[in-house]
Design a protein with these regions (language model features):
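Early extracytoplasmic/lumenal segment of secretory-pathway proteins
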Residues: 27-92
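A bilobed periplasmic-binding-protein/Venus flytrap-type ligand-binding module shared by bacterial periplasmic
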Residues: 132-139, 260-273, 292
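Ligand-binding pocket segment of bilobal, Venus flytrap-like solute-binding proteins
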Residues: 176, 181-251
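A structural signal for short loop-to-beta-strand junctions that line the ligand-binding cleft
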Residues: 78-83, 101-135, 149, 159-162
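Short beta-strand->loop
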Residues: 35-38, 119, 135-137, 143, ...
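Short helix-loop capping/hinge motifs at secondary-structure junctions, enriched
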Residues: 101, 138-146, 178-187, 271-277
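Periplasmic-binding protein-like
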Residues: 158-165, 283-307
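Conserved C-terminal helix/tail region of periplasmic/extracytoplasmic solute-binding proteins
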Residues: 321-350
Length: 350
């Protein structure tokens, strides 16, 4: 996909070095200001479609780091009307910081299942992603790995690769294990997974698939869309080889379902253009935007009935865990403590 360069027209940014803040020009009623953690090339087609349908212009600032800090520092003077980010942990952190406001919308409640949105209407999931296994086609038989619990089975000793346990996606997964098995059970499980690691946790999700391709390990734990990105990466064709070496394996299909996380959005407490911000969230939860999400990023639409991309469909149907993301978010601190307690990131044998 071509990279895009966002021109912030009708938007003035003055950097105050001493204060570390930014002052934006007041937006008109037909505009809104968006802080986005999500990459520009992904969200631009969605925002263009929104503007075309509503006439509302979206002024976007890509803020992969420090989004919460910027909003908190500006307080009521924050120019942000809405935020777009990934992972339940980041959404919940915004909620806990008190920088969001509740939204009551029949459209959002209809489009987004209850377990993928905040019970108070403070944040809304817009896409879902599965934390699944990519297993070696050559060295792992179909049906050999069927659950997260299996990852702690001694038969997989020296065969698992994963990134840091402190990564947001892994913390959410561990939190879900606490929800299902209690903290003591989750700790025992995490110790078992650690014992089965082929190497010290490192790299990103794609690096784990590469390790399977290279024979370092047999099982990689990743988010589903990384498989899609590798399969279609014409700029880095070596990643297609990594993807070709592995088989998508959804976990816990015979019971609760595969662990799920979200990307999502919220309206800020300081929003000067709340009505426009709510319209954006409603649009992003609708059929047209959900289809763009599915086709462009190989994520799962949060709205029931919107089809997955053909590539994702080729991996087969699956059942996702319906555990409340609010519950997962509340258990994240305990999950992070477990990572430290068992010394997960120190690797096997430590």
């Amino acid at each position: 996909m071509p990279q895009f360069k966002r021109l912030l027209t009708a938007l003035t940014v003055t950097v105050a070095t001493a204060a570390g803040t930014a002052t934006w020009a007041q937006a008109a009623d037909t505009e809104l200001n968006l802080y986005s953690y999500r990459q520009p090339f992904l969200i631009q087609p969605l925002l263009d479609a929104f503007t075309k349908e509503t006439g509302i212009k979206v002024n976007t600032v890509f803020a992969k780091k420090g989004m919460l800090e910027k909003i908190k520092a500006a307080g009521d003077n924050s120019p942000a009307d809405a935020v777009l980010t990934v992972d339940i942990g980041r959404l919940y952190a915004l909620k806990e910081a008190g920088v969001l406001q509740a939204v009551k919308s029949d459209v959002l409640e209809k489009n987004i299942p209850a377990h993928f949105r905040d019970p108070e209407g403070l944040w809304f999931g817009l896409t879902t992603r599965a934390r699944m296994a990519l297993v070696s086609k050559e060295r792992v038989k179909p049906g050999e790995l069927t659950s997260y619990e299996d990852l702690a089975d001694p038969k997989f000793k020296g065969r698992i690769c994963v990134r840091s346990g402190k990564n947001a996606y892994n913390v959410a997964l561990i939190a879900s294990m606490i929800a299902h098995h209690g903290e003591e059970g989750a700790e025992k499980w995490l110790q078992g997974v650690k014992a089965n690691l082929a190497r010290k946790p490192q790299g990103n999700d794609r690096a784990q698939a590469k390790a399977v391709y290279e024979g370092v390990c047999d099982i990689a734990i990743t988010n589903n869309y990384y498989m899609g990105k590798m399969m279609t990466n014409d700029d880095k064709p070596e990643q297609k080889k990594w993807a070709a070496a592995v088989r998508v394996t959804y976990l816990n299909q015979n019971d609760r379902g595969n662990h799920m996380n979200v990307s999502g959005a919220a309206v800020t407490k300081s929003a000067k253009n709340k009505e426009a911000a709510v319209k954006l969230l409603e649009f992003l939860s609708g059929d047209a935007a959900q289809k763009i999400y599915a086709e462009d990023n190989q994520e799962y639409p949060v709205k029931p009935g919107v089809p997955y991309s053909k590539l994702v469909q080729s991996w087969g149907d699956f059942k996702g865990d319906t555990l409340s993301l609010e519950k997962i978010a509340k258990l994240r601190p305990a999950a992070s403590r477990l990572v430290d307690k068992v010394g997960f990131d120190e690797g096997p044998g430590s």
